[in-house]
């Protein structure tokens, strides 16, 4: 009886410890923030996640006000938990879309909308 209980407890504890390692990367901060308004011109995007990100296999794309899509180059030398990229922005409404590949192989994706104003 005690052996089974102990085995069950060990299984539960090991499963709980392994769960975070299998979880997908979660976006914890971004520049711009969702819904933000930023000035026109050169802009540095920063997306920070709760785990290490594979910069080489992750993707960022920017949907411009006219509907065109620009695939952004991710800075290879960025922090291991961040995706960083530069773009020139004109006035209008944009959507930044990401596909972040966690170092463990899991992919998470999402998007955020923001506007650019002539300041």
Please state what every model-predicted region is.
Residues 32-33:
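Surface-exposed, proline-enriched loop/turn segments that connect beta strands in immunoglobulin-like
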Residues 18-20:
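N-terminal signal peptide c-region/cleavage motif recognized by signal peptidases
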Residues 27, 36-38, 44-119:
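Acidic, low-complexity Ser/Thr/Gly/Pro-rich repeat segments typical of extracellular/periplasmic
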Residues 1-12:
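Bacterial N-terminal signal peptides that target proteins for export
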């Amino acid at each position: 009886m005690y052996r089974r209980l102990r085995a069950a407890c060990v299984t539960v504890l090991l499963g709980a410890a392994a769960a975070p390692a299998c979880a997908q990367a979660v976006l914890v901060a971004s520049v711009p923030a969702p819904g933000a308004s930023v000035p026109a011109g050169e802009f540095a995007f920063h997306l920070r996640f709760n785990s290490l990100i594979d910069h080489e296999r992750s993707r960022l794309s920017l949907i411009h006000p006219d509907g065109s899509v620009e695939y952004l180059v991710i800075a290879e030398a960025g922090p291991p938990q961040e995706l960083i990229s530069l773009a020139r922005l004109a006035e209008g409404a944009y959507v930044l879309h990401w596909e972040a590949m966690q170092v463990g192989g899991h992919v998470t994706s999402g998007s955020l909308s923001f506007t650019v104003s002539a300041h």
